[in-house]
Amino acid sequence: MDSIRYIRKERGGNRVEKETTPSQSEWLVMEVLWAGDASMTAKEVIQKMQDTTSMSPRMVRVLLNRLWQKGIISYTVDEKDARVYHYFAKKSKEECQKEKSRKFVDSYFAGSNTNAMAALLESTRLTEEQYQELWNILQKKDRDKT
């Protein structure tokens, strides 16, 4: 699924592309939502995050709002209390990973998948199993093209 890119004008008339992927802090919130079986209230997200981060409840709410503005999550209003929202992920973890990876390659490797993969392979120590797994992925991609 292609993401929708939002363009806004900055002062001086320059066009700026609005980010549509989760930031590092937003990713922590998304991990909680992706791990959940169902939608969660802000209070539930905050409770789950208290075990792993020192982020304030206010900041979690701010991040939920940013994620909603980016179209990564959505919410339903509680039937009994209109002040309570139930948040859920609109984009899967895999979708976000692919989009983040694409932006990373575009930003740091001028869109070259080959250069990005070469840099990652050269900077990482892999086991024989990991090399084999990568080889299998490349072969599968090659078969899928034909």
Language-model features and meaning:
Residues 2-31, 110, 144:
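Short alpha-helical segments that sit at the start of domains
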Residues 21-25, 78-99:
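Short, cationic-aromatic polyanion-contact patches
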Residues 47-55:
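Short helix-coil junctions and helix-kink-helix linkers
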Residues 54-66:
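Short amphipathic alpha-helical interaction segments
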Residues 71:
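Glycine-centered, phosphate/nucleic-acid-interacting loop/turn motifs that mediate DNA/RNA or nucleotide
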Residues 75:
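Short beta-strand "wing" residues that participate in macromolecule-binding interfaces
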Residues 98-144:
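Amphipathic alpha-helical dimerization/coiled-coil segments
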